[in-house]
Amino acid sequence: MNKIQDLVRNFENHISKVNSENPDFFQVVAELAKTYGYPLSNAAVFNKNLLKLKNLKYILVADNPGMTEQEEECYLVGKAGKMARNFFANSSLANNFDEEVAVLNKTFIHTKSTLDLKKLKEFKNLFVESQVFMANLAVDMLEASDCELWITGCSELTEKGLFAQYLKTLKERCAENPALKEKIFFYPHFSFGNFSKNLNVVRTSHPEMSVKEALKAATLNIL
């Protein structure tokens, strides 16, 4: 876990650096948040729950920090987060979610809606750099542990999608280490029950499968 802890600390330091070096960035994101009627706490968001990791079993990637996430500095803590936690608990995949599941995002930049990231046009370079950083962080964690990487929310994870750079970085890392592909899985987002709906299609067709077997069969063809 020492390597994982080093990666988490580096992530925390990187977020502090981004926020301190880009005051204009905070102001623009704050103005966007204001249109939705809430004050901004953090434009670039670290996940404090990563500091609780003790026995890493899964790396779970969502899209970007939303309103509650930026306020609490924790990833996946809204409705989708509750669905994710319930799934891991009910499927006996994790006894203690915060200690066993590292939750990351495809970018650390906050917007209320993921598609609002398109409105931050003047910070396109930072958005691209954030995707590279987060993709490398996920793969670095994967290489430093004996776990699986689950990437949820794939509608914008295409060559021309919002998270094209994240996908490109993943492909580059997998080209360097092809064995990684066996440990990376892609699923719909937990929001609106899409993750469970996708999995249930497989489980209905193959009732003989265990949850873990069904999860492997349900992965989307992205890489």
Features from the language model and the residues they span:
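Glycine/proline-rich loop-helix segments at beta-alpha junctions forming the active-site rim
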Residues: 2-6, 10, 111-223
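Active-site and ligand/interface coordination hotspots across diverse enzymes
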Residues: 1-77, 206, 210-223
